[in-house]
């Protein structure tokens, strides 16, 4: 009987990757599978969020008799739970937690990875049914194994990432992750309850026709950014356009679209957020890693995102990220300013 080997599940893919590296311990594969499990559980709740909200408003108790939790707190608990009870993660940092957590048990203290994540980015979009996502970033700890992790294990430059990825809860639910060997996308197949390889070896097109920015802040942006945006608005067929502006206010969705189709996403400095809005460690770094492995570029307007050495867990950064050719055109405007 022929076994269908055409479509690999996430588990099969990570095991195949591990087999390609005889010295691999399997810890990273286990960690990615743990994150996939958390994503499946979050997906169930996200898909019925509207219903739960209505029931939750009625009396704070949902149909299962559970206390209605905020969905992003729920998502945080799911990701933290699978990593804490797994065998591959020594500690975590999360958008939902003030400080990092060292799991500090004998198994976890001997794990070689730490993970940072935004458990449910864009959760403000849930009540209007806009796609949202989970973002994660994996590093090898820098302190010796056998002891609890410390802050320096988390404050590493993004270039040290071992893996990074996201889950987008959209028209379908997809998990996309990158290692230095490539970027691969897996679509959740409800018929078997598994993420199945649907987008092997994702490459970000060198040029695209989509620019993503919040036009509501236009007059707060520095002049080179304004100048570049106006160039985008004036592109013609002859100059690589015409461009279209797409911005749905959910980073995972905007960046997933631009990764697949080509495009540029910008979150520049504004008056009330002079250092940018997006978080370096668990929003900018993971996407910068993914986009660079896929052939794109990511900077804060001055330096490569992955080269920034963080000083705080929740520090913010400006972000310009996307297709290599579009980023280089933007950089030609920014360099004039810097010059
Ligand atoms: P603004 C969502 O709140 C988020 O963190 C990202 O997902 C999104 O790209 C950005 O903020 C949108 O911010 O200020 O344009 O609404």
What are the functions of these language-model segments?
Residues 2-53, 60-62, 73-339:
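IMPase-like, lithium-sensitive Mg2+-dependent phosphomonoesterase catalytic core
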Residues 66-69:
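Alpha-helical scaffold segments that form or flank carboxylate-/histidine-based iron centers
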């Amino acid at each position: 009987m022929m076994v269908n080997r055409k479509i690999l599940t996430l588990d099969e893919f990570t095991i195949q990757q591990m087999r390609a590296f005889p010295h691999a311990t399997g810890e990273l594969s286990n960690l990615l599978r743990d994150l996939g499990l958390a994503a499946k559980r979050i997906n169930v709740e996200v898909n019925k969020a509207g219903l739960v909200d209505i029931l939750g408003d009625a009396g704070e108790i949902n149909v299962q008799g559970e206390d209605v939790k905020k969905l992003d707190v729920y998502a945080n608990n799911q990701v933290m739970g699978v990593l804490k009870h797994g065998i591959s993660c020594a500690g975590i940092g999360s958008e939902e937690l003030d400080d990092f957590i060292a799991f500090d048990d004998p198994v976890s203290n001997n794990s070689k990875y730490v993970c940072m994540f935004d458990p449910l980015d864009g959760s403000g979009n849930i009540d209007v049914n806009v796609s949202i996502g989970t973002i994660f970033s994996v590093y090898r700890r820098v302190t010796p194994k056998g002891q609890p992790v410390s802050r320096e294990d988390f404050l590493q430059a993004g270039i040290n990432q071992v893996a990074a990825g996201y889950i987008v809860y959209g028209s379908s639910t997809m998990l996309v992750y990158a290692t230095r060997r490539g970027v691969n996308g897996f679509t959740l197949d409800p018929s078997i309850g598994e993420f199945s390889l649907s987008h092997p070896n994702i490459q970000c097109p060198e040029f695209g026709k989509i620019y993503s920015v919040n036009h509501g802040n236009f007059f707060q942006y520095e002049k080179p950014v304004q100048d570049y945006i106006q160039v985008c608005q004036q592109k013609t067929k002859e100059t690589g356009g015409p461009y279209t502006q797409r911005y749905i206010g959910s980073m995972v969705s905007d960046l997933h679209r631009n990764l697949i189709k080509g495009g540029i996403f910008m979150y520049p400095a504004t008056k009330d957020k002079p250092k940018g809005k997006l978080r370096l460690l668990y929003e900018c770094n993971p996407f910068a890693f993914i986009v660079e492995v896929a052939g794109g570029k990511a900077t804060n307007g001055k330096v490569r995102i992955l080269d920034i050495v963080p000083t705080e867990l929740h520090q913010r950064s400006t972000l310009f990220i996307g297709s290599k050719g579009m980023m280089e055109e933007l950089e030609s405007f920014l360099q004039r300013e810097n010059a």
